[in-house]
């Protein structure tokens, strides 16, 4: 199920300076200040007055930066290691742009004074800037002039303050005890009421009144605590407003009070179906800060376990997706089949859903005795099982009728909205980070990138089914070619250090005690790592101030971008089509809300 892509993806160019030359030629070198980082891309500071002009230039280049991959902020006021920061930078807003035709990224930063926290919106350049700008305002109080609807997105409408500011409390014990009297309850209920006029919607058309329907936040087809308000003309969706934030737990704030080591279990709970796949971009980014090169065996173990979790996540997607369009039986089979994968995962890591098993510099422990047979049995069994699903369910005429041609979009639209993963590849765009920008040794494995052509709900499902087959191929190669060697790097910042040395050397024992109890001290710098996760591209952008905890942890998840795209895709469709579309996205709200 592979097809040719009209878009050629060249070899990855880390820290590509070509765009810097183009920017200097157009605006002059004095317009930019380069910041050296370990992010693997050019990082350029620009004045606020030039921001929109620079971003428009990058969007319209012959090989354009078509995707606004990420947009967020940093409160710089308590940062002590300020090399590379402009003077007076109390707050930073960064724009991470991606070009597929160049296969390279660039980051544009703007420094803001605490007394003047405003920027022009860039929603006219990239439509997906809408939610990102809302979140920056919600978390930092930075105003975006000209934004179509600048309002809370993660926090409740009645919330006071901006949680990611450094002067905002980080623990519940720093707040007054929670209480809910009748007056406050009524206030919260009224604040949650949807008012069409606030969103530029009419209550009636030329010949009829519209109905406004709350789908969620606890509807089974919403796949979590997610509300989407539908403006309906009969069964037809005239417009809709997704409402997120019900599952927000402040993961990025938590990272500021956990050590580099102790934050690993928190990553498991971002995409809570992704298991160790969540650990991978985080530990890779920390290892960039630390300058750690892990042994080959660590890379292969990490890849093998990440692909196991890709399979378990996709199996759950498959069962619930088929259930969403009306077939009840397959979900029971997919859950039973996931158990076979979890038997292997539990034998290797000791846990099932949330192993928190990767470590800075390696993995928690070596592979156990007998792991080979468990893995071998699984890779021999699953492909035949996928054949059964394809015959029994995916070729079913009812499922095809509910999903083929439904919620369809093309590559251009996908890139404009920041869509990645199977949602992008279902449009025919051959962009998979494991091939396009290999990490952890993926370049040493033979596998294909499943593609489709129509970009509809059916194709998104079929791409994921084929991805499971490719994951089995990768796991099989790990089984056959597992290297010998240590499961941790020999590096001072490997956390915890190799256990056997702590029993022989007092210095290593002291290091073990300090790194586990206090935390390893990472060099002051910024690092970044993206991976091809279960639901699309997931990344961690880390800022170290030379301490035992992260100064700023930015977690970019694929599902946030995917839900923002919903209104542009589903207008004019039926409510039943929306249910099929939501299922085909494959999201969990923890991945959206963090």
Swiss-Prot record:
Keyword Glycosyltransferase: no
EC number: 7.1.1.-
MF-aspect GO terms: NAD binding; NADH dehydrogenase (ubiquinone) activity; NADH:ubiquinone reductase (non-electrogenic) activity; quinone binding
Gene Ontology CC terms, in alphabetical order: NADH dehydrogenase complex; plasma membrane
Stretch list, region NADH dehydrogenase I subunit D: 209-594
UniProt topology in membrane: Peripheral membrane protein
SUPFAM superfamilies noted in UniProt: HydB/Nqo4-like, Nqo5-like
Region annotated NADH dehydrogenase I subunit C, chain positions: 1-185
Described function: NDH-1 shuttles electrons from NADH, via FMN and iron-sulfur (Fe-S) centers, to quinones in the respiratory chain. The immediate electron acceptor for the enzyme in this species is believed to be ubiquinone. Couples the redox reaction to proton translocation (for every two electrons transferred, four hydrogen ions are translocated across the cytoplasmic membrane), and thus conserves the redox energy in a proton gradient.
Subunit field text: NDH-1 is composed of 13 different subunits. Subunits NuoB, CD, E, F, and G constitute the peripheral sector of the complex.
Protein name (database record): NADH-quinone oxidoreductase subunit C/D
Annotated source species: Pseudomonas fluorescens (strain Pf0-1)
């Amino acid at each position: 199920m592979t097809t040719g892509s009209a878009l050629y993806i060249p070899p990855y160019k880390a820290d590509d300076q070509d765009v810097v030359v183009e920017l200097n030629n157009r605006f002059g070198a004095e317009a930019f200040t380069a910041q050296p980082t370990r992010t693997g891309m050019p990082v350029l500071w620009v004045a606020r007055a030039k921001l929109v002009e620079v971003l428009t230039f990058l969007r319209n280049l012959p090989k354009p930066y078509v995707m606004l991959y990420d947009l967020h902020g940093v409160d710089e006021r308590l940062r002590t290691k300020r090399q590379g920061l402009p003077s007076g930078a109390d707050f930073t807003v960064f724009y991470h742009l991606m070009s597929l035709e160049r296969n390279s990224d660039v980051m544009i930063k703007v420094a803001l004074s605490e007394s003047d926290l405003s920027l022009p919106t860039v929603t006219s350049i990239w439509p997906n800037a809408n939610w990102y700008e809302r979140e920056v305002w919600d978390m930092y109080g930075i105003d975006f002039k000209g934004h179509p609807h600048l309002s809370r997105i993660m926090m409740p409408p009645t919330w006071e303050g901006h949680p990611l500011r450094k002067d905002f409390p980080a623990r519940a014990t720093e707040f007054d005890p929670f209480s809910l009297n009748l007056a406050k309850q009524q206030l919260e209920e009224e604040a949650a009421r949807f008012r069409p006029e606030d969103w530029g919607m009419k209550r009636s058309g030329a010949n009829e009144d519209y109905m406004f329907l709350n789908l969620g936040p606890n509807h089974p087809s919403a796949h979590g605590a997610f509300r989407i308000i539908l403006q309906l003309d009969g069964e037809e969706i005239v417009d809709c407003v997704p409402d997120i934030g019900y599952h927000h737990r402040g993961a990025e704030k938590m990272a500021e009070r956990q050590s580099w080591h102790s934050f690993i279990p928190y990553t498991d709970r971002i995409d809570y179906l992704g298991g160790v796949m969540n650990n991978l971009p985080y530990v890779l980014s920390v290892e960039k800060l630390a300058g750690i090169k892990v042994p080959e065996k660590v890379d292969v173990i990490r890849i093998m376990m990440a692909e196991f979790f890709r399979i378990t996540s996709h199996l759950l997607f498959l069962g619930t997706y088929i259930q969403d369009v009306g077939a009840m039986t397959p979900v029971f089979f997919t859950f039973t089949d996931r158990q076979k994968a979890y038997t292997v995962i539990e034998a290797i890591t000791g846990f099932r859903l949330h192993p928190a098993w990767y470590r800075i510099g390696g993995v928690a422990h070596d592979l156990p005795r007998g792991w080979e047979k468990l893995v071998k049995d699984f890779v021999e069994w699953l492909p035949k099982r996928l054949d059964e699903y394809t015959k029994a369910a995916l070729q079913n005429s009812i499922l095809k009728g509910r999903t083929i041609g439904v919620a369809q979009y093309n590559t251009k639209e996908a890139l404009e909205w920041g869509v990645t993963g199977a949602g992008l590849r279902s449009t025919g765009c051959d962009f998979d980070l494991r091939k396009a920008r290999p990490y952890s040794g993926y370049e040493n494995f033979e596998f294909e990138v499943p593609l489709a052509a129509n970009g509809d709900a059916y194709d998104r499902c079929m791409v994921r089914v084929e991805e499971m087959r490719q994951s089995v191929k990768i796991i099989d190669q790990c089984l056959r070619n597992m290297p010998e060697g240590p499961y941790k790097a020999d590096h001072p910042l490997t956390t915890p250090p190799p256990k056997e040395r702590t029993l022989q050397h007092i210095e290593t024992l002291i290091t073990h005690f300090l790194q586990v109890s206090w935390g390893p001290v990472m060099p002051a710098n910024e690092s970044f790592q993206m991976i091809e996760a279960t639901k699309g591209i997931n990344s961690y952008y880390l800022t170290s101030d030379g301490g035992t905890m992260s100064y700023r942890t930015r977690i970019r998840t694929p599902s946030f971008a995917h839900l923002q795209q919903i209104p542009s895709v589903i207008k004019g469709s039926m409510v039943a089509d929306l249910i099929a579309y939501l299922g085909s996205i494959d999201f969990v709200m923890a991945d959206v809300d963090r």
